[in-house]
């Protein structure tokens, strides 16, 4: 849903046995969305770790942004990682092959990854493995993920 999701979509994902979604930006760490249909883990994203803002420039869709250099465009990703690493948190980059996958950008990512992997206490994993891990540590009482009961509002909200 490109960072947009509705109650109906969440319920459809649950009804079709999806374990997680990654469309929302409501937290820095994964949490549970609970509806009358069941539960769905949300593995949150945010624009600070998405390569679209620094590298995308598409006249076809009227998205005309200045393209940043590899170092400048990726600097925010690395700063976001450091903050999450220091806090023992969760960090997820969104790297499109046609954006960050370009040679000069990927060289910068590769150098950074080599440094990060030397730390030995960093885990890179597919989202399904991350969600499985969260379920395991929640089941044995080591962690309690936040639970959002949905819908947030049972009727339209009027401002004014």
Where in the sequence are the language-model features?
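C-terminal domain-boundary segment and adjacent tail
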Residues: 20, 71-160
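Active-site-adjacent pocket scaffolds in enzyme catalytic domains
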Residues: 1-87, 141-143, 159
């Amino acid at each position: 849903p490109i960072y947009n999701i509705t109650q109906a979509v969440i319920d459809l994902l649950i009804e079709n046995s999806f374990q997680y979604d990654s469309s929302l930006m409501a937290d820095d760490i994964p949490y549970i969305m609970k509806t009358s249909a069941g539960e769905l883990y949300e593995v949150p994203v945010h624009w600070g770790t998405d390569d679209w803002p620094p590298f995308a420039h598409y006249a076809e869709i009227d998205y005309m942004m200045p393209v940043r250099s590899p170092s400048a465009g990726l600097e925010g990703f690395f700063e976001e990682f450091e903050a999450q690493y220091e806090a023992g948190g969760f960090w997820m980059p969104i790297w499109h092959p046609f954006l960050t996958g370009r040679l000069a950008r990927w060289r910068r990512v590769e150098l950074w990854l080599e440094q990060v992997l030397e730390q030995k206490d960093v885990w890179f994993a597919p989202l399904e493995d991350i969600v499985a891990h969260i379920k395991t540590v929640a089941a044995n009482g080591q962690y309690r993920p936040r639970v959002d009961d949905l819908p947030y509002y049972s009727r339209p909200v009027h401002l004014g």
